[in-house]
């Protein structure tokens, strides 16, 4: 005798890996936060809506000190989704989970040293889990303008924008960035190497960065504004030339 059994959709658990920004504070922590505040002033929306992992392996913190540190980030609108390098015994629902097995993908140094003038380095990392498998290292083509508040991240290659990038928007690329319109937002290229370049048809950028070295709008020569330019890294300085 054959019995009919009602079939149900299977319950499946699937793994996913996602890119996340990793911040690694260094001592003295107060000075580190001062640098972070300066970065946020230059790029107010940089951390908005972006998950961040906090690496505390460089610090020796008690549980209460770690809670105070997390509060500092919360006060700045930075959402900490996980901890790395923390030794938390027991389970604390008020703490982000401790993450292990992350693979460093690249380093972007956020903070300029005292000797830097037009460019500097920032101390943060973009990290992905070991399970992430890049099928092909190709370019990402964006055929519409990038609006204010949008953030495009493509760490596997170049990013090509057919339109413009508005003020308050940002493009983060593992390779080069090509913008066939006005660049009024932030362009962060070279997450996977210093040979990357940034090209745009109309240069009005809030911030430029290649391999972690950056320049802000207040350091740009006035004669470059509104012109088609190419940006590249030479030594530890960003170079900008007009492309007529």
Swiss-Prot record:
Keywords, sorted A to Z: Cell cycle, Cell division, Septation
Cross-referenced InterPro entries: CAP/MinC_C (IPR016098), MinC (IPR013033), MinC_C_sf (IPR036145), MinC_N (IPR007874), Septum_form_inhib_MinC_C (IPR005526)
Pfam family, one: MinC_C
Keyword Chaperone carried by entry: no
Source superkingdom: Bacteria
HAMAP family, A to Z: MinC
Similarity remark: Belongs to the MinC family.
Assembly and oligomerization: Interacts with MinD and FtsZ.
Name listed for the protein in its UniProt record: Probable septum site-determining protein MinC
Record organism: Beijerinckia indica subsp. indica (strain ATCC 9039 / DSM 1715 / NCIMB 8712)
Lineage: Bacteria, Pseudomonadati, Pseudomonadota, Alphaproteobacteria, Hyphomicrobiales
